[in-house]
Swiss-Prot record:
The keyword Isomerase does not apply. Its main location: cytoplasm. This is Elongation factor 2. The modification Diphthamide is found at residue 605. Keywords: Cytoplasm, Elongation factor, GTP-binding, Nucleotide-binding, Protein biosynthesis. Coiled coil: none annotated. GO terms for biological process: translational elongation. Belongs to the TRAFAC class translation factor GTPase superfamily. Classic translation factor GTPase family. EF-G/EF-2 subfamily. One of its GO terms (cellular component) is ribonucleoprotein complex. Gene3D superfamilies: 3.30.230.10, 3.30.70.240, Elongation Factor G (Translational Gtpase), domain 3 (3.30.70.870), P-loop containing nucleotide triphosphate hydrolases (3.40.50.300), Translation factors (2.40.30.10). GO terms for molecular function: GTP binding; GTPase activity; translation elongation factor activity. InterPro entries: EFG_II (IPR041095), EFG_III/V (IPR035647), EFG_V-like (IPR000640), EFTu-like_2 (IPR004161), P-loop_NTPase (IPR027417), Ribosomal_Su5_D2-typ_SF (IPR020568), Ribsml_uS5_D2-typ_fold_subgr (IPR014721), Small_GTP-bd (IPR005225).
Length: 740
């Protein structure tokens, strides 16, 4: 990469000159289903900016800079790069993010979207719009990111499917129609029509990233090119000529400049969606305008560990200008930090720059405590609200136990794991204080494979990884009676019942429409109007567990000293939600209600060691008397298969408790949408391939939590408890509280 860096340095002054003018900046990134050709497309763009030699582009996978990505030919992390490109006689700076397409890595996509204003959605011409395409487009539209379309692998339509020029045209129209249907479904109302793809306006390109050519309909019309000419180019062997006349990088970068808005335009509609502050304030106005002279506000989108420089935070400057030596305040962490260095990215290389103004993507050294999703501001404005929290679509549902072969290396391993979780918040780390057991949870088996590979690379230590275990959730199916929890010293008594939390409230928590730090009256109004809550109950919410979707409500009145122990009760609530009484799995969808309390007057007798166990024990007794059950994670499968094999594929799914939700058929392909428990998904790949003689594509992603089948529940909970070294028998309420 050293030659690449030299080329960049030559342009650094020019890049900084453009960076000051938001109209000449574009923030975009690739979004796609796995293997549809995003990274190969990105490499072609690097070639255009002189960062890769033409011979190498398309094979180099330069943006796949973690070695495992090159081995597996798949992007795992989101990589950033700033490109210099001249268009219509004007220089532009295009900040480009390459994101992973594999479903296990949607967390990286979510974080990248925060810094983009537009997304180049890459779709394989043969496979068309797939589940992951739908997921990333939906996420992009939720973040008000405008999509444009690149239909890749046109060569496959010609060489593999041997389609005629008319059939190719039909295939492209079908993909555009499917893509526009997603925009119709998920786009904000004011952009449903504006953001639909119109091929005639050049909002779609088609081509082959591998063969480095790409063309839009207006370009084709201008040059007098028809689909038959493209078919000829492949059949008569002059594809290189296509790549010379219509280089992919020029087509894509021109499309980005024309159809993706500059930051000062995009922020006018994105800021009201991403930031809940006062838009008429000094900060609000600067954010809407992407004003480089306004107060500094930066949204952090990812954090990476650098072996030499420590933690590097990457984010977008939404207003102001960040300079080396500036102090920033990390909202939410209540910390002031000094920026030691500012950089821009060129793939894996970071180039030091003296400053970066609003509208650009920047990397910062010195803000070690910042995390993905954090907001950094000028300390004079430390009171402003932060950017909205990021929503991760998938949840960690698969767990492995990690054990060092040499116990002396435990601390080193734990440190490295903590760094991994900082870099990738969709990983979940639990360390059992008593046994020292390390449990790492991820979104899928591949996610964990890559995390453990990175761990080995970084620590150079030997450790064992257990076979993957599935994470479950515990919940209740009815309202319990009231149970009394006594503190160990018998001086405090707390009375609780639990009941199921309704789906609407869970959705309001998931979409962050209601949050713990919201003004209580505003929150109560939303709960009353949208979820039918009673006013007093809605106002009595003490805490919202937005990780597992549970709430605790205070329904008492006039109890002495209750305010003094409120925090301890909330801590006891959170403690009990992390591992329920059935099988020590997290609780989900539970409303915990405090109805009465007797609190000792002396603070020495009502500390956390008294109140937390009393809370937890009463909640556990209540859960066990409210028809508790397990929820298991289901995956959604989207399958494309030759019609002759539908029967065989269906019987494989049935055997694994799968359920077909939808089926459509075209002449050479059938499309099935199904749900399948994660528990049943481990060896299904081989079975599906065998059933369809290899003629099958499919993709999986997390769908939802569903109740475990009643007929299998008792035995399964016992097995689960045994695996965890617990007593096999399911506990009774009286194991936690005294009954008179």
């Amino acid at each position: 990469m050293s030659s690449a860096v030299r080329i960049v340095e030559k342009q650094l002054d020019e890049i900084l000159a453009i960076a000051k003018n938001p109209a000449q900046i574009r923030n975009a990134g690739t979004l796609a289903h796995v293997d549809h050709g995003k990274t190969t497309t990105s490499d072609s763009l690097l070639m255009g900016a002189g960062l890769l030699s033409p011979k190498v582009a398309g094979k180099a996978l330069a943006m796949d800079y973690v070695p495992i990505e090159q081995l597996r030919q798949m992007t795992v992390k989101a990589a950033n790069i700033s490109l210099y490109f001249e268009y219509g006689g004007k220089p532009y700076l295009i900040n480009f993010v390459d994101t992973p397409g594999h479903v296990d890595f949607t967390g990286h996509v979510t974080r990248s979207l925060r810094v983009m204003d537009g997304g180049l959605v890459v779709v394989d011409a043969v496979e068309g719009v797939m589940t992951q395409t739908e997921t990333v487009v939906r996420q992009a539209l939720e973040e008000y990111v405008r999509p444009v379309l690149f239909i890749n692998k046109i060569d496959r339509l010609i060489k593999e499917l041997r389609l005629s020029p008319q059939e190719i045209q039909q295939r492209i129209l079908t993909i555009v129609k499917d893509f526009n249907a997603l925009i119709d479904m998920f786009a904000p109302p004011e952009f449903k029509d504006k953001w639909k793809i119109d091929p005639g306006k050049g909002q779609m390109a088609l081509g082959s990233a591998l063969h480095k050519w790409g063309i839009t309909i207006p370009m084709a019309q201008k040059a007098g090119i028809k689909f038959s000419n493209i078919v000829d180019a492949y059949e008569k062997g002059y594809v290189d000529q296509l790549a010379q006349e219509f280089p992919l990088y020029k087509t894509i970068l021109s499309m980005i400049i024309e159809h993706i808005p500059p930051p000062n335009v995009a922020q006018k509609y994105r800021i009201p969606r991403l930031w809940r502050g006062e838009l008429n304030s000094e900060v609000g106005k600067a954010l809407l305008e992407a004003d480089p002279n306004g107060p500094t506000v930066i949204a952090v989108s990812k954090v990476n560990k650098d072996p030499h420089a420590g933690l590097i935070a990457t984010g977008r400057v939404f207003s102001g200008t960040i300079r080396e030596g500036d102090e920033v305040y990390i909202i939410g962490r209540r910390l002031k930090k000094k920026v030691l260095q500012t950089y821009i990215y060129m793939g894996p290389s970071r180039i030091i720059v003296p400053y970066m103004p609003a509208g650009n993507i920047v990397a910062l050294m010195g803000v070690d405590e910042a995390r993905a999703g954090d907001t950094l501001v000028d300390p004079k404005f430390s009171e402003i609200p932060p950017f909205e929290k990021m929503r991760y679509i998938s949840e960690p549902v698969v767990t492995v136990a990690i054990e060092p072969k040499n116990p002396a290396e435990l601390a080193r391993l734990v440190e490295a794991l903590k760094d991994l979780v900082v870099e990738d918040p969709t990983l979940d780390l639990k360390i059992d204080q008593e046994t020292g057991q390390i449990l790492l949870s991820g979104v899928g088996t591949l996610h964990l494979e890559i995390a453990t590979w990175l761990l080995k690379e970084r620590t150079k230590t030997e450790f064992t990884v257990s076979p993957p275990l599935i994470r479950f959730r515990e919940t209740v199916r009815e309202r319990s009676q009231v149970w009394e929890g006594k503190s160990p010293n018998k001086h405090n008594r707390l009375y609780f019942y639990v009941e199921p939390l309704d789906e609407t409230t869970i959705e309001l928590i998931a979409s962050r429409e209601i949050t713990e730090d919201q003004e209580p009256r505003e929150r109560a109004k939303i709960l009353r109007e949208k979820a039918g809550w009673d006013t007093d109950e809605a106002r009595g919410i003490w805490a919202i567990d937005d990780r597992y979707f549970n709430v605790i409500v205070d329904k008492t009145s006039g109890i002495q000293y209750l305010r003094e122990i409120r925090d301890y009760i909330v801590q006891g609530f959170r403690w009990s939600m992390e591992a329920g009484p059935l099988a020590q799995e997290p609780m989900r969808g539970v409303k915990v209600v405090l109805v009465d309390a007797v609190v000792h007057e002396d603070p020495a007798h009502r500390g956390p060691a008294q109140i937390m166990p009393a809370t937890k024990n009463a909640i556990f007794a209540a859960v066990l008397s409210a028809r508790p059950t397990l929820l298991e994670p289901l995956m959604r499968l989207d399958i494309k298969v030759a019609p002759d094999y539908i029967g065989a594929v269906t019987s494989v799914l049935n055997k694994h408790r799968g359920k077909i939700l939808d089926m459509t058929q075209q002449e050479y392909m059938a499309f099935l949408r199904a749900e399948l428990p994660v528990l049943e998904s481990f060896n299904i790949s081989d079975e599906l391939r065998a059933a369809a003689a290899g003629k099958i594509f499919w993709s999986m992603q997390f769908a939802r939590w569903a109740p475990f089948p009643e007929s299998m529940l008792g035995d399964f909970v016992k097995q689960l408890r045994k695996k965890k070294g617990l007593k096999e028998e399911i506990p009774k309420p009286t194991d936690f509280v005294e009954v008179y």
